[in-house]
Amino acid sequence: MTLFRDRGVVLRTIRLGEADRIVTLMTEHHGKVRAVAKGVRRTKSRFGSRLEPLSHVALLGWQGRGDLDIINQVEVIDTFRVVREDLDRMAPAMSMLEVVDQIAQERHGNPRLYEMLVGALAALAERDSPMVAPAFFLKVLALEGSAPVLDVCVSCGEDDSERLVAFDLTEGGVLCRSCRRGRPVSPGGLALMRRTLGGGLAGVLAEAASPVVDEVTALATEAMQAHLDRRLRSVRAGQVS
């Protein structure tokens, strides 16, 4: 077995036997890693509560010959305690973990996705912004090469913003008045999505809750679910309408 060091965010855990857990992490250099934490469920475990979902950790482990590695040592970088203790922040945080769990490839490094996840969790800990998760979804879609087309009608090429009035997941972007189908998109919603993908993230995260933010949240969530070809279990009931 090969010894490795890395940093990672715990995405999820499942029980293994009487005392162990299988921990899934998004790491900086090794992509998604599934590893056994031996004895983690014992009262006097050397890991304590450091391997719970959301924990950002530095780890030392052994890379196994099969699908599972073995965690040897763990040091906490951040527990994102503010997020854990606030249900309004925990829900979007868990949806972001779920997205990364679905997109990341095992043992295939994706430092940018790791950095985006850590950055999004830090932003959520800093402020209870309703735009953190939808912005994360849109940015991840862009990273995947699947960002929605927002500047021109994906059917006919119309580029007059005032005529772009609908969003169609099948087509992968906005549609004009002549081609419209799918769900309506408001000028404000279209502008906010463009700002999100255009680099004005600080201003986007400063947006207060509003009908436009709700609209973008629904659109971004639907776009991500279409990309994954599955519903996100962690998305609150009623969040997508």
Model segments located where?
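Non-catalytic alpha-helical scaffolds and adjoining flexible linkers that form interface surfaces
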Residues: 1-241
